[in-house]
Amino acid sequence: MKQHTPPVNLRVQRSALAATGLALLSLLLACGKPAGVGGAAGEASSSTAASNAQVTQSLPLDQREDFEDAQRGFIAKPTGKLLAADGSVLNDFDAYGFLAGPAPATANPSLWRHAQLNANVGLYKVMDGVYQLRGFDIANLTLIEGKSGWIVVDALTSRESAAAAMAFADQHLGKKPVSALIFTHAHVDHFGGALGVISQQEVAQRKVPVVAPAGFMEEATSENVMVGTGMGRRSIYQFGRDLPRSALGNLDNGLGKDVVYGAMGVLAPNWLIYQASQPMQLDGVDFIFHNVPNAECPAELTFSIPSKKLYNGAENLSHTMHNLLPIRGAKVRDALRWANYMDQALEQTKDTEVFIASHHWPIWGNARGQELIAKHRDVYKYTHDQTVRLINAGYTPREIAEMVKLPASLSDYFGARGYYGDLRHNVKAVYQFYMGFYDGNPANLNPLPPTESAKRYLDLVGGADKAVAAAQVAYDKGDYRWAAELLNHAVLGDPSSQSAKTLLAQTYEQMGYASEAATWRNAYLTGAQELRHGPPAQGVPKAAAIDLLFQTPTERFLEAMAASLDGPAAADKNLKINLVLTDQKESYVLWLENAVLHFKRGTAADAHATLLLTKPLFVKMIAGTAGVKDTLLSDELQVKGSKIDLVRFFGLIDKAAGVFPVVTR
């Protein structure tokens, strides 16, 4: 995009501009960190050990076919640590070495097996001309040999992990240029490392095809802008970011190992896939792309290479039951549409012999690959159909989650077990998709908030000590769900009860140790950790996504700003501000009306103030990477009109730091 020289800076009083800068940069402010009760992770209880032993008896955990597939074609493995520019560790390739042994009592043996499979890190030959780099990030980077270079499929999460993967491939396969780049879908772990694969300048100079599904850029740049802070905080639970990598902590994430939170960016695609079947040749290789939107991701594609009898199922297909609604939060996914895409995939793969995806390991052989697709089709359709049947029979989401059980033909199949998604929360997702939050019982239409309800429960039972005593009885019996319910009331109703926090941490720990879903294990163990040590000092930093945010439409930022307005504080305010992005030829008028922040294109002559700045500076301030000094001395920022009103306006925007307490209040 052409850059326009901003007008000469109009000097203003340093004190007023300082106040403006401080208001605009308030995202840097952090909220207080509640203290925990201290303590360390414990061992498995006898009940948990017995539960995990039962899993060993009920599943053929010694099945070796998956291990043979996961290790097939091995070329080389990276060692050591992947470091960021500041020296911090982004990925430790040796961190999961503890998985080499048998499952301990502190791990569900089925999850342990899956975690062992995902621990096969390195460069692998899938077939002639097709290679995968696994374990450099949570997703796979796939290389397909074209006539002149590599066709790269998915670019991982960060510039650092993608660059490391490409360098490793260069080392072992020989250096080749990138001749095309394919983004299978608009989740950041598949495109965020694009700038580590190839630069924007090289794409433009060599006219390198960048292929993506229709709607990709809109989804890629806006997915987490609106509720990114809250979703990011919850993702720390889902992915177990702060847990130790050990038999007492993080084993896996279900789809792979760690998400590499380095520098994230994106390249705008120059070829979009709109059709259900769209042929295209890339660097001499004939592809058939399939547009499959609004299932696993709002913008997604799969593809076949007929000459190689190869099919890539993107993230619609994997070696786990996926999420219909991830516990970090998202819009509910359409289970029926997902099942229908799997049915179409069966037709598309009648002649396929090699099946790969955006996560996990390949499958060789048509019958086995089609079995995986059919099992996934039927897991999602069974979950959908049985949930709908029970909705129509009058059951509530929590009841249905207890009632729906997969038939043995599905539940005994490792490739569709709940390591990332979970049947119980997927059932609730189907309910939410059709019925929303309300279960139909008027008692649940306007219940008390959790803290107020907890206080009244404690009054009823005679205080937190009585609740803890009852919970201890449940804990000793291995009735952890009931113990957690009692103790959650005790912790919320009486924050001073150290015994409640201590026992709840122990309870969550046992629930985590028994969980087959890696995401559930991570959530329980993170809850236990935060009860002991408090919330983290740092959330998921916006600064890491600065290159991605540069490409986000300004309207998305303004929508998020409006959703951050402190409504009660704005109730009697009548302010109007012009925002002019001097390098983009974009102007917006922002105004308050009925405690709502509105905006539209253009400027208003009666605005109280006009803020002129470049979009990069605007984005840096939102991301928290532009310091006050940078702002004050920048020629990229000017203020016209009332600086006091400008400060008042931005002072009404909430400053969410993303480290709020989750298991306490």
In which residue ranges do the predicted regions lie?
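Bacterial N-terminal signal peptides that target proteins for export
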Residues: 2-20
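Accessory terminal helices/loops
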Residues: 36-112, 228-259, 347-354, 361-555
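Divalent metal-coordination and catalytic microenvironments
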Residues: 129, 144, 154, 169, ...
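Conserved beta-strand hairpin/beta-sheet module of binuclear metal-dependent hydrolase folds
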Residues: 116-176, 300-305, 309-315
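Active-site HxH/HxHxD metal-binding segment of metal-dependent hydrolases
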Residues: 60, 64, 69-72, 161, ...
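C-terminal motif of bacterial Sec signal peptides marking the signal peptidase cleavage site
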Residues: 27-30
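Feature captures hydrophobic
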Residues: 33, 38-39, 479-485, 492, ...
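Metallo-beta-lactamase
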Residues: 149-150, 157-159, 261, 265-270, ...
